[in-house]
Structures are given as structure tokens and as C-alpha cells.
Amino acid sequence: MPTTIIHSDDAFTTQELVFRANDTNRFPAVRTPLSSIFEVENISDRAASIDVEAATLPGLTDGTWGEVLPMSQVNRERKNFALIPPKVGKLFNVKLDEIQSVRQTATVTRESLQSVQDRKMGQVFLSLEDFHERARLQGILGRVINYAGATLYDLRQAAFFDTEPNPVLGLELDAANPAPGALRLKLAALTRSIEDRLQIGQNTPTGYDVQANSDLFDLLRWHPETMEAFKRWEDLARPEGSPLVPFRFAGFDFHDYRRTGLASGRAVVIPRGVPGMYKTIFGPGDFMSVLNQPGFARYVSVEDARHDKGFEYEVSTNPIHMCNRPEAIFELDAGAGDNDTNP
């Protein structure tokens, strides 16, 4: 059967390819250090409308039993802004020699063509996931980026959340004679500062992840205070324990972040458990057959290559990764810190 006839099959329409690409049984989601903390939202509009107060609890009013509660007095208009998701993707070709090699009894079946297609799609999906992870880290730090790493939106600016740059707390891990308990005191003050910024009682974190550049991770792992804590923790005190495994100290879970995006000697503190604090928004695809539908994580379309020399595929995604409470995100520095932050 000629490949052009197979390719006109309903299985190769844009809509069916999109459903196939987002089938998690066929293409399982890749777990990354930051993927689990982001809530996913799918929108059908070209722009995402962001409510600045979406991650805060509403105020209450006093009333009289037996009467309707009075309307709350609003002193200012609710602030919203719009973000347009960037399109990121890749073109790839399924060439004649790739199809020729999977022929079965001189014919090309739908399944054999799909096997070549799925293999190449899977490779592109891994590249997309690498971009998503970079964009998640920058989203936590208050920036929406494109694939090249350029900042499309700095959400800390006045037009958006109107917050100051991320405070940088210096841990002074390289101090020659650190005072006993000094590191714990710094981290305790950091905890209070984050909780104050999140309005403790309304948004209380359930924990803190620290994704650290390897330099900071190693300095902290072998810091005198940390080593003293390990002596009381039998499993990590054993010689065969890996020095690269995550560890908990002073209420923070420290991880050796092996991905790109963190400068040497730097770390980012990520509060966990605050509903709606981290969001991934997938915008709609730019194909007629999926117009006005909620956005998918992956889009795929195909057309015949020029002069009948194979098939050309486009794989794309339209994501925004963002943090709704950028004022509560702190960075750590192994030295004194950039701005001498003292929570």
C-alpha cells in the first residue's frame, strides 16, 4: 500500500495526532525535580488572564444573626493582567529511507509508519521537557521565558505583581570559624520571613525544598553544623551513604540540582503546599482542527514533504510556567549574598 494512502488515514489527522501525543500511556510524563509542584491549567483563549489576588484568601465581614451579611467594602479594583504563552517546538522529517527500512512484505502498514513517527516524536518530547524544566525554574524566580532563555515577562515588575527582586540570603558557608548554631539561626529567620510574606494563617507552607547548585550543596553537606546533625542520623552517618542524596536540615529539604539555570554557589528556596502558588498554563494550538479547544501540553501536525520525499511533522507546545507569589521566593548564596539580605 502506498504511503500516501496510509497517510490519508484518520489516524494521521492533526486532531488524532494531538490525542496520541498526549496519551500518557504511550508517552509517559517525565518526572523532573520541579514538575510535581506545578498545577496545570488548560485555556482556550490566546491570552491567559492572571488575577493578582488569586493565591490569597478573601477577607470576611461581621454581620448580625438573621440578616444578610453586608457587602465587603472594596477600596481598589481587583488587579488582573494578561500573558500570551510562547510557542516552542521543532520540525522533523520522516524520510524515505526510514520508511523503507520498516517495510513488511513489500508494503508499508499504518503501524510501521506510526512506529517511526512515535520514536521521533518521543525524542522531541524529551527536548520539550528539558525546556519545561528550565522554564519552571525561571517561573519560580518570577520570569516567563522562551526557548532561547530570553525573558518575555518579568512578573516582579509594577505591571504585574509589583514586587522587589528576589532577596538573596548569604549563608556564609565558607566562614573560617562559624559561630555554633549560626546557620540554624539564619534558616529559622528565613522560615519566618517567608511565612510572613505568605501571610501565615492564610497560606502556610507544608515544607520547603531548596534546589541548590552543586557547589552550594557540597559546602552545606560538609558544613560543621550539618555534619553534627548527621552524626545523630544513623542512615546518613554510615560511610556507604551517597553524598549526593537529598537531606533535611533545619526544616529545609536540600537537593543537588543537576539541571541548568542556577549560578555557581546559588540555590532557590521553594515553599511547598500553598494552593495555586505555582502554575503551568497551556495555551491553545494554532491549528484549525483544534481551534477554540482547551490547550494541550503537546501539539503535532503532519504534511507531505516537498516532491513526495517523505513527511514533515511539527511538534509544539504553548506554555507559561509561573509563580503567583514571587515575593515569597528567596535565593541562597554560599557566601555573603548579593544584597546582604537579613530576613
Predicted segments with their positions:
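Hydrophobic alpha-helical segments and helix pairs
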Residues: 5-28, 151-184
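Long, contiguous amphipathic alpha-helices that act as assembly "spine/axial" helices in icosahedral shell
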Residues: 85-164, 192-214, 218, 309-316
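Assembly/oligomerization interface modules of large self-assembling protein complexes
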Residues: 34-104
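Short, Φ-rich (hydrophobic/aromatic) sequence segments
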Residues: 21-24, 186-194, 281, 285-290, ...
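Sequence/fold signature of self-assembling virion shell proteins
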Residues: 224-343
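N-terminal alpha-helical "arm" segments
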Residues: 1-46, 324-343
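Ordered core of a single globular domain
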Residues: 184-238, 243-246
